[in-house]
């Protein structure tokens, strides 16, 4: 299979989920063997680095890449869409420290890629072919198994101690189904997580338009009012538990976790031929697994 890049550029602008900063992002065609590279156009010298696991420095509610002054947060949704559509080479220019969150999914990235199309290049794709089972287990009970397969496949299972999200599964057995089955799954959080995240200086750009918020633990009306006021949202009835906005899929949280896995594992720096099976994944665990797999890949060269 040959490498591919974009046929034409496309652009987005919007606020960052965690910084709240308004950001412009340009996606440009790139020469073969470039990989996915991100340029901070707002910094002196326009520092540019490849989006690979080597530069992951933080994973609190998103994946952060950092090397010296160069730092870009919440890269996983854009990377997920690029990987799913087979974009091997692309230069992403951003004028701030974070990718725009858009609606919290990969939908708009997918639509843009579909609109401009792909350009086949001369070089062959770089592919890591899984030849034997690989297993990673975290101390917190997260698991990842990567198995040999004829193609790229992902299975996800998530569990939470709550009635709404006690257990969900999502699967993707063909990347051709990504646009329909995965791309519109939005990032999510629980109401009980919002105040701690705000205190950590995160989700400054969060609202009900760019995240699926889950209200599963009853709280006082005063407490819920505080949360919605902080997010600049209309006040809600504290007696009504559930999702605070309509679902795009019945198992949207699990599908979004799958979306994140594709983006995080793309930090390997090449394509993967194998089946990824995960239990209780998250950005920290995903990127730790990717780093170990990348070290294995580099050591074999």
Can you name each region flagged by the protein language model?
Residues 1-301:
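Short acidic-hydrophobic catalytic motif
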